[in-house]
Amino acid sequence: MAFRLPVVAAPEMPVGTQTSGSGRLPKWLKRPIPQKNSNHLTAELMEELRLETVCENAKCPNRMECYSQQTATFMILGNVCTRPCGFCAVHRGRPPQLPEADEPDRVAEAAARLGLKHVVITSVTRDDLPDGGAEHFYQCVVAVRERTGATTEVLTPDFVHCKPALGRVIEAAPDVFNHNMETVPRLYRRVRGPKSDYRWTLEMMRQVKRYNPDVKTKSGLMLGLGEQRGELLDALADLREYDVDFLTLGQYLQPGEKYLPVVRYVAPEEFDELAVLAKDMGFKKVASGPFVRSSYHARDMAETST
């Protein structure tokens, strides 16, 4: 049975004290206009090695900060996703090609040239592949470790059509396994699409620990999609019941008109409060703030784990 914290605010109210997400951004979500990506070594290297980053494809608000620090989250298996998630800016459709056999070597080359100490590897969802791309994840993790000695983190799709594929990813022994819950059960299929499964998301975390107890597990949620406070705390309790180690909480930002609207903007102080509650639940490390994303400062989270 999941551990439940007492709800400290009226559960009928969504998380956040601000007005609805329509209209102008609150001041804490405003940032200076970034310079062109071509001025940054990381972006140039990605182009040279024909690599995709989730930073660009998902329009991450932190990408210029990460590029300036010569860090990036590699996105393997192409840039076309087979899932119609309502929040994600990655192009959706039928992927035009099979995985590129030399991509693991190119990822390792980029990691080596950037001098990365912690490498995050994610992907689009590939329901068109028999193993969902698990073998490609395995090859990328092994290539990075052999070439650089860096710690590795995978941020995977759910492999819902090939659940045994999860074991192949864990055979590569990444230091951190990340799969994002994204939202609360009531909103799950609206946000993540009709093929998503909240319970399987949790079960993945349990399976990872069964395959390799030394692998740290991590998950994250976006706030501002209409979740209620009690629902959010229950979802966090579910993650802890399934022994998830690390947690990220960030503000959902609508990437374009055709995507799910922002219901509310959550104030920074509330993110701080939620971080305290999550740590009290037993998460070993929590990153909580308006601009937090699943791989934001991932190295810091991995290195400070015990």
Say what each PLM segment does.
Residues 1-73, 89, 105, 109, ...:
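Auxiliary Fe-S-binding modules of radical SAM enzymes
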Residues 56, 76-77, 122, 155, ...:
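A secondary-structure boundary/capping signal
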Residues 79, 157-160, 226, 291:
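Short, surface-exposed acidic/glycine-rich loop or hinge patches that mediate macromolecular interfaces
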Residues 89-106, 111-205, 218, 246-248:
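Core AdoMet radical
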